[in-house]
C-alpha cells in the first residue's frame, strides 16, 4: 500500500509492503509484488497510467473528486470484487445521511464562500466546487463565489478579484504540511492589508479547516466535514 501522510492504517494492513506515497509509488516494488490490479485516484491518472502500463500491470483510476464519484466507485468495486451487498450498505448509509442533512437547512439562506487551499512553500490556490472541499461546501449549502471553475478543481485568482466578490465566509485548508501552511496563512492575512478590507475578515468569519476532513480526495470522514461546515455556515441559526 502507499504510505498515508497523516491517516492511521488499519491493523490488518500494517504489515503490508510499503510502496511509497500515492503520487510517486515505487514501481520496482509494485512490479515484484505482481498485483492483479492497482487502484489509484483519477487525479493521478495522467502521472501514473503510463508507468503502470510500463510494468504491465492493470490499473483502475477511481473518481475521488467528490462524494458522488466516490460512491459510484464503491458501487463499481462492489461489482468487481463480488462485494455488492457490502457496497450497497455503504451507499444506502450515504444517501440516508445526505437526505437527513439537507432537510435541516433546505430553507436557509446560502452564505457566499471563498475557499483557499494552502500549498507547502508559501502559496495557495482557490478551491472551486469541482474540488473535493468545494463539493463538501456545496453539499453543506454554501455558495462558492467562483462556482465550479469551469470544471477546474483549483484556480489562481488575485486577492483584488476575491475582494470584489466579497465573500461572507473565508475557509482555509491545506494540501499537505498543515502546521506550516496555516502559519503561512496567518502571515499572509496579517501582512497583506488587502485582506483587512474583506467583510469576512472584519466580521471574524475566517475559519481554518482540518485537512484530515478537508483535503484533496473524498473519504469516509465526510460526515465530520459536513458537521464542521454546519457549525460554520449556520452558526446563527
Model-predicted segments: where are they?
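Structured C-terminal subdomain patch of bacterial secreted/periplasmic proteins
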Residues: 71-74, 79, 88, 92, ...
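Extracytoplasmic ligand-binding site segments that recognize negatively charged/polar headgroups
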Residues: 47, 63-76, 110-132, 178-180
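Alpha-to-beta junction loops
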Residues: 33-38, 142, 165-170
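Short helices/loops that flank or line small-molecule/ion binding pockets
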Residues: 27-34, 54-55, 157-166
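Basic- and aromatic-lined ligand-binding clefts that recognize polyanionic substrates
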Residues: 86-141
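Flexible loop/hinge segments that line or gate small-molecule binding clefts
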Residues: 9-10, 44-76, 80
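His/Asp/Glu-enriched short active-site or ligand-binding loop at hydrolase and phosphoryl-transfer sites
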Residues: 130-153, 172, 208
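A short, structured surface patch at a secondary-structure boundary
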Residues: 1-33, 37-43, 145
Amino acid at each position: 500500500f502507499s504510505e498515508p501522510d497523516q491517516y492511521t492504517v488499519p491493523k490488518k494492513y500494517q504489515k503490508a509492503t510499503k510502496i511509497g506515497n500515492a503520487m510517486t509509488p515505487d514501481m520496482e516494488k509494485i512490479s515484484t509484488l505482481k498485483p492483479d490490479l492497482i487502484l489509484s485516484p483519477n487525479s493521478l491518472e495522467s502521472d501514473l497510467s503510463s508507468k503502470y502500463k510500463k510494468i504491465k500491470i492493470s490499473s483502475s483510476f477511481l473518481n475521488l473528486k467528490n462524494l458522488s464519484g466516490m460512491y459510484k466507485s464503491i458501487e463499481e468495486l462492489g461489482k468487481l470484487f463480488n462485494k455488492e451487498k457490502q457496497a450497497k450498505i455503504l451507499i444506502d448509509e450515504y444517501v440516508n445521511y445526505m437526505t437527513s442533512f439537507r432537510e435541516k437547512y433546505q430553507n436557509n439562506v446560502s452564505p457566499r464562500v471563498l475557499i483557499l487551499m494552502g500549498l507547502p512553500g508559501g502559496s495557495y490556490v482557490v478551491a472551486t466546487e469541482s474540488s473535493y472541499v468545494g463539493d463538501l461546501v456545496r453539499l453543506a449549502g454554501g455558495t462558492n463565489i467562483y462556482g465550479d471553475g469551469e470544471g477546474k478543481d483549483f484556480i489562481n485568482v488575485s486577492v483584488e478579484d476575491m475582494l470584489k466578490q466579497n465573500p461572507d465566509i473565508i475557509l482555509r485548508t491545506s494540501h499537505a504540511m498543515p502546521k506550516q501552511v496555516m502559519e503561512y496563512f496567518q502571515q499572509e492575512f496579517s501582512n497583506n492589508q488587502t485582506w483587512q478590507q474583506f467583510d469576512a475578515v472584519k466580521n471574524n468569519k475566517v475559519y481554518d479547516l482540518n485537512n484530515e476532513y478537508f483535503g484533496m480526495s473524498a473519504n469516509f470522514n465526510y460526515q465530520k466535514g459536513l458537521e464542521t461546515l454546519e457549525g460554520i455556515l449556520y452558526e446563527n441559526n
